[in-house]
Amino acid sequence: MLAFPIGQRVSVRCQGLVLGGYGGWVSLGTASANPVYQNGFIPQDEIPVRLRKREGIEAMRPDTLRIAELEAVHVGCFIAFENVQFVDGELGSAWCDSDADSDRHLVDERGDTLLVRTSRYARFATRPLPAGSGYLEGILGWFNKSYQLRVIDARNAVMDSPRFIPCMDSDGND
């Protein structure tokens, strides 16, 4: 499996691939054999031919935002959040269930929440979620009318501060 660090320049060979949409997200893939989907996954053995690393890695710093500040312009961007934690009901859970990609929920001090989506194939999928509060960064996505954060590596979570009690509404009122 190819892995690209954030900021890696890549070339994509698109000949023979098709654009499709799924859950409000545009994707590039193979022609789909299933009429439910507009395109399919690129076979694993084709990935090294279709995606090639180019010279140079651009140093990337995430934009630090509040959950309430998320907008469509941030989709596909490397972003970060401070003073966040996973919701109480998910403490003790792994980043991902073993049988399917999974959703977890991040909350900030104002009570705003964001879905965190983790692939069951992520190297850190079986590790427990951080139990404290702190900093988390990832790539923002959009699926079925909801923002979702894709964390690249568990090291992108520095959440060792004490937990907080979120406000009851998203206006920051008690």
What are these regions (language model features)?
Residues 1-174:
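OB-fold nucleic-acid-binding modules
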